[in-house]
A protein has these predicted regions:
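Conserved class I S-adenosyl-L-methionine
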Residues: 1-43, 56, 60, 80, 138-170
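Class I SAM-dependent methyltransferase SAM/SAH-binding core
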Residues: 48, 54-96
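A short acidic, Gly/Pro-enriched loop at the edge of an enzyme's catalytic core
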Residues: 95-107
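A short SAM/SAH-binding and catalytic strip from SAM-dependent methyltransferases
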Residues: 105-120
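Acceptor-substrate binding/catalytic loop of class I
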Residues: 116, 180-194
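A short glycine-rich, Lys/Arg-flanked "PGG" loop and its adjoining helix->strand segment in the class I
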Residues: 123-135
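C-terminal lobe and adjacent flexible extensions of AdoMet/dcAdoMet transferase-like proteins
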Residues: 199, 203-263
Length: 263
């Protein structure tokens, strides 16, 4: 219950509603969108957006012609997402989806795995995603890099603060992010790039492919103008696409997207 309360308190502040529209969040959004557009079945596909927040991705999915159902545990997020044309939004838990077997052609978990520190819960959420996805459909899950907190606190100058350094050093070892103030995010789990493939496999999702979303560009793109003009932004996206599946660079990316076809 403590875990749920800490995460709920963070999201009830409403910061997630507009996070993907500006700064680093915009780069995460653009790269998630372009990778998914390459991998999703042609529209109209039935897409389940699990932990879809306020509907940032559900909005463009619906605009692309997909049939979108969003599931999220936060009433505030469901309220916002439910107001988007073409999006059906309901309350729910990634570990216990109230959805029939093989009902969707794509199931997305673009947030839930961040907030499940227990591996068993993460595997359960992935199993549920596989269960509700028809054979031949895809399951795609986003994870935060084990090293994102370290680079984030260095870039923001907070690593020199003793308590920030303590929790940051600890999460590099354990993956569990235990913040003491909400400027440092909320309780979360940061994956080593290799362990998500093992979790997919344990859930019955084999031959998983990983995509580094922001690469190292999340450390500078919003400050150096790479997201302010069509030409510069297009060049940045081209560059990131060229190295998105280079394993030696996975750890520097803030987020990975892992995808598997349900068999």
């Amino acid at each position: 219950m403590e875990t749920i309360a800490a995460i709920s308190d963070y999201y009830e502040r409403g910061g997630e509603v507009g996070r993907l529209r500006a700064g680093r969040g915009r780069l995460e959004f653009l790269r998630t969108q372009e990778v998914l557009r390459r991998l999703l079945p042609p529209a109209p596909a039935r897409v389940l957006d699990v932990g879809g927040g306020a509907g940032a991705h559900a909005r463009w999915l619906a605009a692309d012609g997909h049939q979108v159902r969003l599931v999220d545990p936060m009433p505030l997020h469901v309220q916002h997402a439910g107001a988007i044309d073409g999006v059906d939004a309901v309350l729910g838990d990634a570990r216990r989806l109230a959805e029939p077997d093989a009902a969707y052609q794509a199931t997305l978990l673009l947030g839930p795995l961040y907030h499940l520190p227990d591996r068993r819960d993460r595997v359960t959420a992935l199993r549920e995603a596989a269960r509700v996805t028809a054979p031949g459909g895809i399951v795609a899950a986003a994870t935060i890099s084990r090293y994102a907190g370290l680079y984030d606190t260095l870039v923001r100058g907070r690593y020199i603060e003793p308590e920030v350094r303590r929790i940051t050093d600890e999460e590099v070892v354990t993956g569990v992010h235990h913040p003491f103030d909400q400027d440092l995010f909320t309780l979360a789990y940061f994956h080593h790039p290799d362990e998500i493939v093992d979790e997919f496999a344990e859930a019955g999702l084999t031959r998983a492919s990983r995509y580094a979303l922001e690469g190292g560009a999340w450390l500078f793109a919003d400050r150096d103008g790479w997201l302010e003009g069509d030409e510069r932004t297009a060049a940045l996206l081209d560059a990131l696409r060229s190295v998105e599946q280079e394993p030696s660079l996975f750890g520097i990316s803030s987020h990975l997207l892992t995808v598997s076809v349900v068999r």
